[in-house]
Each structure stands twice: as C-alpha cells, then as structure tokens.
UniProtKB/Swiss-Prot annotation:
The modification Phosphoserine is found at S481. It comes from the Eukaryota. This is ATP-dependent RNA helicase DDX1. Belongs to the DEAD box helicase family. DDX1 subfamily. The helicase domain is involved in the stimulation of RELA transcriptional activity. The keyword ATP-binding applies. Phosphorylated by ATM kinase; phosphorylation is increased in response to ionizing radiation (IR). Found in a multi-helicase-TICAM1 complex at least composed of DHX36, DDX1, DDX21 and TICAM1; this complex exists in resting cells with or without poly(I:C) RNA ligand stimulation. Interacts with DHX36. Interacts (via B30.2/SPRY domain) with DDX21 (via N-terminus); this interaction serves as bridges to TICAM1. Interacts with FAM98A (via N- and C-terminus). Interacts with PHF5A (via C-terminus). Interacts with MBNL1. Interacts with CSTF2. Interacts with HNRNPK. Interacts with ATM. Interacts with RELA (via C-terminus). Component of the tRNA-splicing ligase complex. Interacts with PQBP1. It comes from Pongo abelii (Sumatran orangutan). It catalyses: ATP + H2O = ADP + phosphate + H(+). Residues 70-247 form the B30.2/SPRY domain. The modification N6-acetyllysine is found at K239, K268, K281.
Length: 740
C-alpha cells in the first residue's frame, strides 16, 4: 500500500491494490502512474502481463473520481470554460481554429507542432478592423515556421492563399502561394515583430527590433475584413506575446499592443468551438473516460480490473460500463441512461452508439487506446480519428484532454504517426525494447514438406477438413500443381499438430491458427480424435476462441481453459491479443503469423516466471494458398477463391520468407527438427520438463559467476579502500587538533 501511495495514488485504490497482492508496482506502473496523475499524455510499451492495464486504470480512476468530487462540491478549475465563446474573451491562439497536429499550451500563447512532414497552422481568438497594431513571436527551436496575419476565410497554411500574409524563417514573405525574398532568416532565440497598419493598408515585420521594411500592401478585397494573428509550423515551437507581458522590442510610430486595442476595433473569431467544448450540465450518457480495446476479451479483462481497483471508492461511487458487440444493445443503453463515468469498449459497438448519439463524448477527460498497434492493424485508424475529433480538447474545468496509448511496440510507424496526430507532447515509456526470446523459451521449427513426406497421399479421407480454398481445383496425387502441394500442406499440418501433442504428451497448450475457419477445422479434427469441448480430461479436449463465436461462448471457453477443464485453446492472433494467460508450457503455431511481432507475442506466452516452455512452429516449405478477405462481408459466405490481384479473396502464403524475416528480426536462427517432432534437449539445461521451473543455479549461470568473480573481487577491494580513506579523512583533523 505504501509503495503505491508514494506515487500519489489515493488510499482507497491503494487498499484495493494491496488486497490483490500487488505489494510493489511493476516497472511500467512505477513509470507511468505518476506521469498520468501529473496530467501528461503517455505512450507506454511493455510485455503482456507486465501490469499495463493497472498502469493506466489506476490513475484514470483516481482523476475521474477527483473530477466528480469537485463537481459534487461545486468547485471549478482555475480556467473554467463554460462555452467556447469564453475562450474568445482574451487574446490567445484559438484551440478551435487550428490544425490537427497543432498544440497550444495552457496559457494559450505557447504553440507547437511536431509533425515533420506537414504544415499545421492556427489563428488567434480575436482580429482587428482598424488601427495600428503589433505583437511579438519568440522562436523556441530551429523548426520551420511562418507568422503574420490572415482573415477568417484564409487557409491555416498561412500565405498560400489570397487571404493571408506570412513571413517565414527562411527569409521569405508569402501571399497567395508567392514566396519572395524579404528581410533575413530567423531561427531559435530570435524575436519577430508583426506590424499591421489597417488604416494605410500596410503589413511589415521586424527581427530582434530591426525594422525589415514594408512587406505587403493589403489589397482592396480585404479592406473590410478583420485580420487575425496567425502562424503555421513544421516541427517547431513558438510563443506569442500580444502585449500582456512586456515586449522585448516595444513598437514605435504609434503602433499599440493587441491587448490594448479598443473594443470597437476588435472582432471575435467565428470559431468559438461550441460543438467542441465540454458542456457543464450533467449528461448521463457522457462518460469522463473512454477506454478502447481491440477485442471483447481484453475489454472484459480491463473492466474487471477497474471494478477491483474502485472497490473502496465511495461518495461519489464510480459507474463503469462495458460496450461490446454481441450483447443486447438495450441493456447497454439502459445503463447509459442511468449515468456512466468510465466506458470500456470495442470499436464496432462504440462507433454505433456514438454515431447515433446514444453515447456522448462531450465530457471525456481521458481517451485510452489499449493495444493500439492491434487497433491500427485491424483498420480502426479512421475510427480513432473520428472519436478524437468529437472529444473536446478542453474540459469544463479547464483541464486538457489526456490521451494514453498502450502498444506492444512503440516502434511501429503507424503508432508513431497516430501519436503525433492526437497526442500533446507525449512522454514515451518503453520498457519493452527490441523483441527477443526469453531464456525460458525453446522455440523450434518443423518443416512441412509435402514432397518428402507423402503421408498426405495415404490418408485417403481420414484427415483434417481443409478450408475449401482448393474446392474447385484438382488436388489429387499426381497433379503436381502448386494447388496440389498447397492442399497437401493443409492436410499435413493437421497431422503434425496431433503428432506434436502425442510426442510431448502435452497437458496444456495454446494452438494458433491463421483464420477462424482454420480454428474451426482443427477443433473438428480433435473431436474426430475423441476430444473436443465436452471431453474433460481427454488427450484432445479443446475449446475455440475467435471472433465468430458468441461472446458468452468465448468467455466460457477462456475460463474453461484457464481452469484446466480442457487442455487446448485453439485461437487466432486477434482473439488472443493481450489475454491474461500465464505459464502455459506449450504453444503450437499451425501457421506463422504474417506480422513478425506477433511471433514474439505468441511464443512469449510460454516460459513465464522462470518456467520452461516449448513453442513449435509448423512451417510449409512450399507456398500455401490461403484466404485473404478484402470483400465487404469480411469472409462471411464468401467462396471467391480467385487471387486478390484478380479480384478474389486468396493469396499465396510464403512461410519460408516469413521465417527468414522473423529470424532477421530476432537476430537468431531458429532450430529445425524432423517431422517426428522429437526436440533435442539443450545441452546446458539437462533434462527439461516444460511448464516446470528451471533448476536453481542451472543452465549456464555458473559460467557467468566464474567470469564475473575477478571483477566483483576488484570492486570489493575498491569499496574497502574508499571506506578506509573516508574514515581517515574524518578523524585525522580531530587527532591533529588534540596533539596541538
């Protein structure tokens, strides 16, 4: 309890955490919880099972509770914002008139865009119709920027249309896409003065107090339009001074600060953000936190954690809701109508409820994207951007929207691009590093070669049912076509999976298949072997986990596997992502994943907590034709076996190429074993029992001790010398004083 309390976690949550036997925070929790409680956006990456869910759930629960408590007691933040219009009452950059990657500090004056490929701009909250006016901009780094003036009609890309005037760091002035030499270049630590004389129709600039001369004459078509301070940035940071602070280089010749302009000269921005500002009145269907998960199982797992963490929170109590598909929407709607504070859900149902107005995002304070790489790989990038655009950037109590992104890897290009677009100066917490295979995992490859192993010819019809990709092809022995070898691979993989289970007498394993139909076919084959879901204790007892199974069945199947009622969990990557299953002794990859990171995710499920684990991958030596649905039904009722490039829904799958990519990614060569799947014992480990802990002090540990022993002895001698020297220095002056 004390360990979590030291990070600022409230006692009620710390008590609940202690009851869960979490005596100390994990590394990811120790790093992330204080950052989130401090109000920052956080990108976090750590292994599955490292406590990521707690790392974001604990601070989210606490801040939601504190927000509700403040509302209950009638407190408001320092910068209460009742409507978007109140933002317009002061001179600042307008949070409702800016590019998607343009960030504005809490003072409204410090601005930044870290997009390196695109320009993102912003205008101020007020403009001017008359008079002579001046403001300053200080450059905080060496990024690219343009500053100046524009009308409400102008593009945010300042100077690229006929309604804006810009001056850029490269020493160019710009108007209507015409870039001409002007003044001189400016960069970090320079201060640019922006002058506007509306009465004469002149625009000019200064650098560090040096007048650069007339830049533009305002054309007649803009004489009756208000001009607003504006800028556009590319990987740059600026700070505006509209006159509230003392100018570094005060203007002369009758120019006055914008903040001192008479009210009659001022025009407020039309972008008041009414649709983007948190409403202060209570809305039952408007949660304070939205947590998006890629699968039902992960969403349920996260919700259960939230229920445990909030166990002792009272007055006000927090109300949570799970929004997932496959469950009657009316039940979810009835809970929404009674009020909800934290929503955990999957994209499909969330999108439905938001688009129909049943779920209101106007009061969301936290947006959490769990397993963001999984969400993006499933094609939910547009959904995430739509959700983010509907959530106000500033809440009713003046707090900024916090975005937390959890990902198995932060090195994904898509995750980086997403973070640049929707996050505000995020802190990266990467405790995962480069992918590697733990010491407790043995992983081997079994080549599936239909040309050398002709077992598939002798099986007749007593083999696993295949996926019907070759239903219209001639796959009979002797055809010697790519289709025949492909069908043979599918048959052999079913046999090899059974052989692996028998050879290693597996009592528990996760079996990964590439598609849902592959999972179903393998389950049916295990039923033919006498096993299946209802055969508790049988050698081939199994359950299936994938997106086409009903939610209740998926939940029940997962629980039965965890309890040990069945030996095997047959699943797809998507269904298994992030599920909290620990210490499984075996994993079988019936097909290698098409994303190399998923290989590490799969085999990382064995050999945890110092328990040895074995991962067996069945890798075809020939190309296999597989389903790759691009149709609108996503495979339901689709029998189009033509190749994708011919308008169909199949591709040729090259597992040998995937294997080489995985080996390159891990910087190792994966051992291959014969089709009899007898795995040779590692010479350092001696006899291995998978699922059991390694022998204490076993392996090559003794060798490490021998190597390090001289260094440790040297350090011990150095420490003794330092301590002795310190004591001599401490007592010697006193002894000298006594003798004198």
């Amino acid at each position: 309890m004390a360990a979590f309390s030291e990070m600022g976690v409230m006692p009620e949550i710390a008590q609940a955490v202690e009851e869960m036997d979490w005596l100390l925070p994990t590394d990811i929790q120790a790093e992330s919880i204080p950052l989130i409680l401090g109000g920052g956006d956080v990108l976090m990456a750590a292994e599955t099972g490292s406590g990521k869910t707690g790392a974001f759930s604990i601070p989210v629960i606490q801040i939601v509770y504190e927000t509700l408590k403040d509302q209950q007691e009638g407190k408001k933040g320092k910068t209460t914002i009742k409507t978007g219009a109140s933002v317009l009452n002061k001179w600042q950059m307008n949070p409702y008139d800016r590019g998607s990657a343009f960030a504005i500090g809490s003072d409204g004056l410090c601005c930044q865009s870290r997009e390196v490929k695109e320009w993102h701009g912003c205008r101020a909250t007020k403009g001017l119709m008359k008079g002579k006016h001046y403001y300053e901009v200080s450059c905080h780094d060496q990024g690219l920027c343009r500053v100046g003036w524009s009308t409400m009609q102008a593009s945010l890309d300042l100077g690229t249309d006929k309604f804006g005037f810009g001056f850029g760091g490269t020493g160019k002035k710009s108007h209507n896409k015409q870039f001409d030499n002007y003044g001189e270049e400016f960069t970090m630590h320079d201060t640019i003065g922006c002058y506007l004389d509306i009465d004469k129709g002149h625009v000019k600039f200064s650098k560090n107090g040096k007048d650069l001369g007339l830049a533009f004459e305002i054309p007649p078509h803009m004489k009756n339009q208000a001009l607003f301070p504006a800028c556009v940035l590319k990987n740059a940071e600026l700070k505006f001074n509209f006159g509230e602070e003392e100018f570094k280089f005060p203007p002369k010749d009758g120019f006055v600060a914008l903040s001192k302009a008479p009210d009659g000269y001022i025009v407020k921005s039309q972008h008041s953000g009414n649709a983007q500002v948190t409403q202060t009145k209570f809305l039952p269907n408007a949660p304070k936190a939205l947590i998006v998960e890629p699968s039902r199982e992960l969403a349920e797992q996260t919700l259960n954690n939230i229920k445990q963490f909030k166990k002792y929170i009272d007055n006000p109590k927090l109300r949570e809701l799970l929004i997932i598909g496959g469950v009657a929407a009316r039940d979810q709607l009835s809970v929404l109508e009674n009020g909800v504070d934290i929503v955990v859900g999957t994209p499909g149902r969330l999108d439905d409820l938001v688009s129909t107005g049943k779920l209101n995002l106007s009061q969301v304070r936290f947006l959490v994207l769990d397993e963001a790489d999984g969400l993006l790989s499933q094609g939910y990038s547009d959904f995430i951007n739509r959700m983010h655009n509907q959530i106000p950037q500033v809440t009713s109590d003046g707090k900024r929207l916090q975005v937390i992104v959890c990902s198995a890897t932060l090195h994904s290009f898509d995750v980086k691009k997403l973070s640049e677009k929707i996050m505000h100066f995020p802190t990266w917490v990467d405790l995962k590093g480069e992918d590697s295979v733990p010491d407790t995992v043995h992983h081997v490859v079994v080549p599936v070669n239909p040309k050398t192993d002709r077992l598939w010819e002798r099986l007749g019809k007593s083999h696993i049912r295949t996926d019907d990709v070759h239903a219209k092809d001639n796959t009979r022995p002797g055809a010697n076509s790519p289709e025949m070898w492909s069908e043979a691979i599918k048959i052999l993989k079913g046999e090899y999976a059974v052989r692996a289970i028998k050879e290693h007498k597996m009592d528990q394993a996760i079996i990964f298949c590439r598609t849902k139909i592959d999972c179903d076919n393998l389950e049916q084959y295990f039923i033919q072997q006498g096993g299946g879901p209802d055969k508790k204790g049988h050698q081939f007892s199994c359950v299936c986990l994938h997106g086409d199974r009903k939610p209740h069945e998926r939940k029940q199947n997962l629980e039965r596997f965890k309890k040990g009622d069945v030996r095997f969990l047959i699943c797809t990557d998507v269904a298994a992502r992030g599920i909290d299953i620990h210490g499984v002794p075996y994993v079988i990859n019936v097909t290698l994943p098409d994303e190399k990171q998923n290989y590490v995710h799969r085999i990382g499920r064995v050999g945890r907590a110092e328990r040895m684990g074995l991962a067996i991958s069945l890798v075809a030596t020939e190309k296999e034709k597989v389903w790759y649905h691009v149709c609108s039904s996503r495979g339901k009722g689709c029998y189009n076996t033509r190749l994708k490039e011919d308008g169909g829904c199949t591709i040729w799958y090259n597992e040998m190429q995937l294997l080489s990519e995985i080996e390159e990614h891990l910087n190792c060569t994966i051992s291959q074993v014969e089709p009899d799947i007898k795995v040779p014992v590692d010479e350092f480990d001696g006899k291995v029992t998978y699922g059991q802990k390694r022998a204490a002090g076993g392996g090559s540990y003794k060798g490490h001790v021998d190597i390090l022993a001289p260094t440790v002895q040297g350090l011990a001698a150095l420490e003794k010398e330092a301590q002795t020297s310190f004591l001599h220095l401490g007592y010697l002056p006193n002894q000298l004083f006594r003798t004198s």
